């Protein structure tokens, strides 16, 4: 049986949790202009930008290498949670399960957090653990912070 695991981290943010949630929920098309050093393109494959179960294709750079990721988005507005379920792409060559969960919380007027949870399962025991992807995701969320504040 292949190894599986869960990584969890929190990224402190500025502004409002609602504004950050809206950017991640509805405005993925703005990511390449805002953080092009991480995300070079996002296209809708099926559905709409803001629709539950929309399928999108992301072009990004992780560890200096261009990669592609196809995901299905799940939305939980009540809890300000967005889940991207991995379907295809570079990361899916090594992982059988790759779910990314972003939860935005306004703890106080000056204390906003994005909790990132990555649930993963390797295809084989020989595949590396995806810790580099968690580092990448944390950097994407942190770098998007300034752009959300300016919006």
UniProtKB/Swiss-Prot annotation:
GN (gene name): MLP329
An annotated GO BP: defense response
GO CC term, one of those recorded: mitochondrion
Family: Belongs to the MLP family.
The name this protein goes by in its record: MLP-like protein 329
InterPro entries: Bet_v_I/MLP, MLP-like, START-like_dom_sf
Database matches in Pfam families: Bet_v_1
GO terms assigned for molecular function: copper ion binding
